[in-house]
A protein has these predicted regions:
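Active-site/ligand-binding-proximal alpha/beta "capping" segment
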Residues: 160-214
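Amphipathic alpha-helical repeat scaffolds
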Residues: 92-99, 144, 213-217
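Short, glycine/polar-rich helix-capping loops at beta-to-alpha or helix-loop-helix junctions
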Residues: 23, 119-125, 188-197
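Structured adenosyl-cofactor binding patch, chiefly the S-adenosyl-L-methionine
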Residues: 128-133, 192-235
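N-terminal positively charged helical leader segments and presequences
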Residues: 1-77
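Hydrophobic, well-structured mid-protein blocks that either form specific transmembrane helices
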Residues: 83-131
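Short beta->alpha connector loops at strand-helix junctions that form conserved
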Residues: 42, 62, 89, 115-116, ...
Length: 235
């Protein structure tokens, strides 16, 4: 059963003010029967929602609802696995989020945690970039990331932060424990408070001239390192 099947799709219908005749009247009747929210708005509002021609009505669909933290723990328990979460600290690029979701699904991570502020949310662009992974990877959106990290630690997780000045090479990570990996923002990395809450700091060795990797590339390397160690090849 896909995670997507467990959530309720949210729909809002915008109707142009003064347009309640003919087919629109039927739309309003059906919306009322199905308890769908209807909002009467100026024509300009509908034109912002619909890029092309319209007939005085538009529907806005939120095809993904955010999960709760308990859902991530439940996903790990259902697989009889140690929790493996991803924390994204103020990631703003929707393509990076979509790409990270693809990798998270590939390695069997149990979910992603993002902040409500200064972070990209679940949008159509993210859905497209994830190429379907958004249907399978639960995402939790939290108000206070530091407090969430504290809660995770109280529930037994060890948190690995990625930092260019990290004290350990990421290849030395011990992943035989419940864990979460923090990926910082594209331009600034992890915030100071988030960094201070991490149990371990690791870095990706760089032998070339550039000093950093794209957030989604760095995430892919770290997530597959966890996968490689948790599911080693049989000799």
């Amino acid at each position: 059963l896909k995670y997507y099947d467990l959530i309720e799709i949210s729909i809002k219908i915008y109707v142009q003010e003064g347009s309640q005749k003919g087919v629109l009247k039927q739309v309003l009747t059906l919306a009322k029967e199905r308890k769908i929210q209807v909002q009467f708005v100026p024509k300009q509002k509908i034109e912002k929602v619909v890029s092309g021609a319209h007939q005085g009505v538009a529907a806005q669909v939120a095809a993904y609802q955010y999960a709760e933290l308990d859902d991530l723990f439940a996903a790990a328990e259902a697989k009889d696995e140690m929790p493996f979460f991803i924390i994204l600290d103020e990631l703003e690029d929707p393509h990076n989020l979509g790409s990270i979701m693809r990798t998270a699904d590939s390695v069997g991570a149990h979910g992603i945690i993002i902040p409500k502020r200064r972070s990209v949310g679940l949008t159509q662009t993210v859905a497209k970039a994830s190429t379907g992974a958004m249907e399978y990877v639960p995402v939790v959106r939290v108000t206070n990331m530091v407090r969430t990290m504290e809660e995770l630690q109280k529930r037994g997780l060890w948190i690995f932060g990625t930092d260019a000045k990290g004290s350990s090479d990421y290849r030395t990570m011990d992943v035989d424990m419940p864990l979460a990996i923090v990926i910082g923002s594209e331009g600034f990395g992890m915030s100071r408070l988030v960094r201070e809450k991490c149990d371990f700091l690791v870095h990706l060795p760089m032998r070339g001239k550039v000093t950093s990797l794209n957030a989604s590339v760095a995430a892919s390397l770290l997530l597959y390192e966890v996968y490689r160690k948790r599911f080693p090849l049989e000799k």
